[in-house]
Each structure stands twice: as C-alpha cells, then as structure tokens.
Regions:
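N-terminal beta-loop-helix "entrance" segment that forms/cooperates
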Residues: 34-60, 228-230
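Buried hydrophobic packing segments
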Residues: 24, 28, 206, 298-306, ...
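Glycine-rich phosphate/pyrophosphate-binding loop and the adjoining helix
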Residues: 142-188, 192-196, 317, 321-354
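Glycine-rich phosphate/nucleotide-binding loop
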Residues: 50-52, 229-330
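Glycine-rich phosphate/diphosphate-binding loop of Rossmann-like nucleotide-binding domains
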Residues: 9-26, 30-32, 151-224, 236
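Short acidic loop-to-helix transition motifs that present clustered carboxylates
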Residues: 114, 221-228
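Buried hydrophobic positions in well-ordered alpha/beta secondary-structure cores of metabolic enzymes
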Residues: 14-17, 71, 132, 174, ...
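N-terminal glycine-rich phosphate/adenylate-binding segment common to multiple enzyme folds
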Residues: 51-157, 245
Length: 354
C-alpha cells in the first residue's frame, strides 16, 4: 500500500481525543514535509459537539467517501457525558468497524523503559508482544435480550457469536504477522475447557491453521492462566490471538505492563485494506482542555498506521523517539514527566526535525 496519494480521514472525537490527535497530526505533517510522503489529511467534524449542534452522528456520504477514497482513518477517542446514550460514538465506531470489516484489533504490548515495568525482577525487554483480538464477533455483537425486566424472575441473555470464517481469518492474520515480523511463537488464548462449543471451534481451527506454519511454535493457553503468566513472566508471549471479550481484558492488563493506557496504541485492521488506528485510552472528559493528556500512545498509533501504509521504517523511528521521550523525562505526569500534551508533541516533532 505505497503507490499514489494516501488520504487519511482524521476524526479527533471527544475530550482528550482532540488534543492527542492534534499532536498525531503534527507528526504526520512533519513526516510529509521532511520525507515527501504523499499524504492528504481530511479533517472531519464528527463527535459529541457536532451531534449536540445538529444531531449528526456519522453521515452515510462521509462513510462512503472514507470507504472509496481513504487509505486509513486516525481516530482520537469518543465519549462525552453530555451524550449519555453515546449515539454518536456507536454510529462512528460501529459504522467503521463493521462497515469496513475491521476484524483484527491489533494491540502491541511493548514496555519502552525499565522504570515503567511494574513487575519485580523484570525489565522492559521482558514485555514485547502483540495481541490480535477478534473485532467483529463474539459476545460484543449484542445478540440476546431481557425478559421480565425489573421483576424477581428477570432473565438476561447475551449470546457469543463465533463463525469459522471469523475465527480462522484472525488466527491466520496472527500467524502471518508472526512470519512477517520474525517472531517464532503464537499463542491462542481461550476457555475451551468451559466454553465447549464456541471455544472448541477456536481450539480446533487454531491448530488446523498452525499446520500451514511449521516454522512457528503454536501454543494454546487458557485465558485465566495467561493472566497469571502475564504478571509472572510476560516474555513467554510474542504473538497472542484471542476472542473479542478476552482480548479486551488481557490487553488492558498488558497496558499496565507498558506504562498505562497513555502508552498503548492500536489498529483496527483489515489486512491490506483500509483500516482505522486509534490510541487505546478513552476521551477522559475530566482531563479535557487541561493539557494533561499523554500523546505518546497516539504517536505510536501513527507509527502503526505508517507501517500499514507501506513505510515501516517510520514506525521504528517513532517508537525510538517515544522511548527517548520517556528516557529523558520529556513526557506527561502519568509516566513520570512534567510536560503538557503540547510540549511532548513539540519534543517529538523537534526530534524528527533534528
């Protein structure tokens, strides 16, 4: 994905999303200026402010333009207490995730400095793995319902949807990623000992696909055991693939190993196709407008996007600059520094120019 102009839809969203995306955009504009990358940034006025102003959530014509003209989407964060039903957030997030079939939620869990590692006897080098979370199926699809609500006989059901197609493609993506990045081991985390139908499918398909990658070690782990191992020895993991629900849980545990959500980038990816990239953290309304938000997750996310667009050398470069910002304390308070959001962005951009 390297030929021609790359149009990037930019959706800052709500709360601190607008502040961290501003710094991500500055990084992109600097890369474009210095390296001559054919990038076109399309800034979209979507979020809680727009919804409260005129009721707009995610217009169909905007989605169609994204689908047909863009190479990537950079999203900040969505969520605002003035919109308790999250109507705008649901339309934007689900519209992109399902409309673009972004079936891989890819979450690098990389600790970039020893001082950020919370585990006794471990260092940053012990935490470097990537989680592939299935992103379009599972218990989050919303199948189910309630019966006799508000009574002593109330029943609530959520159904866990797993298709062979959905399971196989995210597992295959994890193996392909391991091959492409020189990793040697892929774990699949499930609860097939308890979820004997849905996760038996995961178990069976994982080892069927693994036969196509004899150069890789394919290992199964129950997700509860994985949580134990993550706080004992995270170095045992290189690539992990799991379902939607479990991926949501283990990646937040992973964020605790890398310095918090302010250090966690992510991609919602359809391999080889238009994909969406966002920092993991939320909109954090209490922090909005105070220049306190950590933009480094967004910088790392921009790096992931550059790899997706065909320039992996820029992800490596941005990762090293983030490492340098942490090492030199040119960072926000959540990771031990004293700088504000804008000043951290200034530091990263300055180092790019340096």
């Amino acid at each position: 994905m390297t030929s021609g102009t790359k149009k990037i839809a930019v959706i800052p969203g709500d709360g601190i999303g607008t502040e961290v995306v501003r710094e991500g955009v500055r990084v992109l504009e600097t890369l474009k200026e210095l390296r001559g990358y054919p990038l076109e940034l399309w800034h979209l006025d979507l979020g809680a402010d727009r919804y409260l102003r005129d009721g707009t959530t995610f217009p169909k014509e905007v989605f169609e333009t994204i689908r047909t003209e863009c190479s990537a989407v950079l999203l900040g964060a969505l969520g605002d207490p003035r919109v308790p039903g999250l109507e705008h957030a649901k339309d934007i997030l689900f519209g992109l995730r399902f409309g673009l079939d972004l079936y891989c939620n890819v979450r690098p869990v990389v600790c970039l400095a020893d001082r950020l590692m919370p585990l006794k006897g471990k260092t940053a080098k012990d935490c470097n793995f990537v989680v592939f979370r299935e992103n379009t199926e599972g218990i989050y699809v919303g199948m189910g319902g309630q019966f006799k609500r508000g009574t002593p006989d109330e029943i609530a059901i959520n159904e866990d949807l797993n298709t062979r197609k959905g399971v196989e493609r995210v597992i295959r993506a994890a193996f392909e990623f391991a091959v492409q990045t020189g990793r040697k081991r892929v774990h699949m985390a499930d609860k097939s000992n308890a979820m004997r139908h849905a996760h038996e499918l995961w178990y069976r398909v994982f080892f069927e696909v693994a036969k196509e990658y004899p150069q890789l070690e394919a290992k199964h782990v129950y997700v509860d055991a994985m949580c134990l191992y993550l706080v004992q020895d995270p170095s045992m993991f290189e690539v992990v693939v799991t379902c939607n629900l479990f991926g949501d849980i283990v990646t937040d545990l992973g964020a605790g190993l890398q310095g918090g959500l302010g250090m966690a980038g992510s991609g919602n990816i359809n391999p080889g196709k238009l994909s969406m990239f966002e920092p993991v953290h939320g909109s954090a309304p209490p922090l909005a407008g105070k220049d306190l938000a950590n933009p480094l997750a967004t910088v790392l996310t921009v790096g992931m996007m550059m790899t997706h667009l065909g320039w992996p050398e820029e992800e490596a470069r941005l990762t090293e600059l983030v490492r340098d910002a942490i090492d030199t304390m040119n960072c926000t308070a959540d990771v031990g520094g004293k700088l504000g959001t804008r000043a951290v962005g200034d530091y990263i951009v300055g180092r790019l120019r340096g």
